[in-house]
Amino acid sequence: MKEGLNFIAIDFETATPKRASICEVGICVVRNGEVVETRSWLVQPEENLYSYWNMQCHGIRPEDTENSPSFPEVWEEIERLYLDEFDTFVAHNAPFDRSCLEHSAKLYRLHLPEINWQCSLKTARQVYDFGCNTLGYLCERLGIPEGTHHRAGDDAEMCARLFIQELKDSGLWIPYACPSLEDPCHRLSVRLEADSSYGPDARSLSSAAN
């Protein structure tokens, strides 16, 4: 897609601290600046192993995924249904989600297409001056409807709506005034670096704000 605001917001939940232990995937599809679809899949991580702290965070347990598809099965569906149309992924603390995808691809020997990654967390730090930039706090502060935190589908939709608002507030995208604007995601002056500037998954920090 070359016109309008088009992207997929994506969120991964993991069963253990290992980035390749994905146990849930959520996506939210945005076409021309509108949320048109939100989906999530439970995923059986390798050997269906979970850590206590990860279960405490998202509430997903081994019995929830014992009959779920593996990550390669879920990724094949996402790739088949969406990736011919979309080449931009948005995530909140994108280095975390990007790392989950890349580690899983390495584990399962999957070929990944070229993806343009954008980060609603880093964008928030550039556009706003709120001090706290967790997904829950930003959505509450900006009046964005909140779902169940740390469930992949709800987090993906919250991220999508947040990113749309960030682009509006930054002036990079004006709905209706410029409907043929080349995809603003590619114009966003946010470039991700493979460094530790984000620290651990920011969605898990300052839980009181969530």
Model features per residue range: what roles?
Residues 1-114, 129-132, 136-150:
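Conserved non-catalytic scaffold segment of RNase H-like nuclease domains
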Residues 111-124:
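Conserved beta-strand -> loop -> alpha-helix junction used to position metal-binding or nucleic-acid-contacting
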Residues 84, 107, 126-129, 165-169, ...:
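A structural signal for alpha-helix termini and helix-coil/disorder junctions
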Residues 1-2, 161-210:
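Acidic two-metal-ion nuclease catalytic site recognized across multiple nuclease folds
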Residues 151-165:
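Acidic, divalent-metal-coordinating active-site segment for phosphoryl/phosphodiester hydrolysis
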Residues 12-14, 120, 159:
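Ser/Thr-centric signal marking residues that sit
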Residues 101, 123, 159-163:
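Buried hydrophobic packing segments
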